[in-house]
């Protein structure tokens, strides 16, 4: 059984979204993923971190975003957590094209993208306490 784990913590500045995406991609590179698999994970991480910054912290740059990545037998679990304002109605925000910020010309496709590119998605949130997004992706490991 192969296992590994990484933790990352950064402030909610939009510039850190690219860092988070690349850091997670570099960590999962040990599984020898395809370019498409790396791209899928980077996109999903980008969407989750962007949601934390824009919606959770409402672009305030003093929030903290935590990422935990765990590898276990070819399955990667990525957990992205913020202590932002939380989500009141999770089923509603997970509907395609729903956006709470139409003023920002957001597409409302973040959770749809995460669901499409990953093998599993779980969103947990509590009003005024924050949100946790847990995503899973399976990789074929060559022995």
Swiss-Prot record:
EC number: 2.7.11.1
A Pfam family of this chain: HATPase_c_2
SMART domains from the UniProt entry: HATPase_c
Protein family (similarity comment): Belongs to the anti-sigma-factor family.
Protein function: Binds to sigma F and blocks its ability to form an RNA polymerase holoenzyme (E-sigma F). Phosphorylates SpoIIAA on a serine residue. This phosphorylation may enable SpoIIAA to act as an anti-anti-sigma factor that counteracts SpoIIAB and thus releases sigma F from inhibition.
HAMAP family per the UniProt record, alphabetical: Anti_sigma_F
Protein name, UniProt field: Anti-sigma F factor
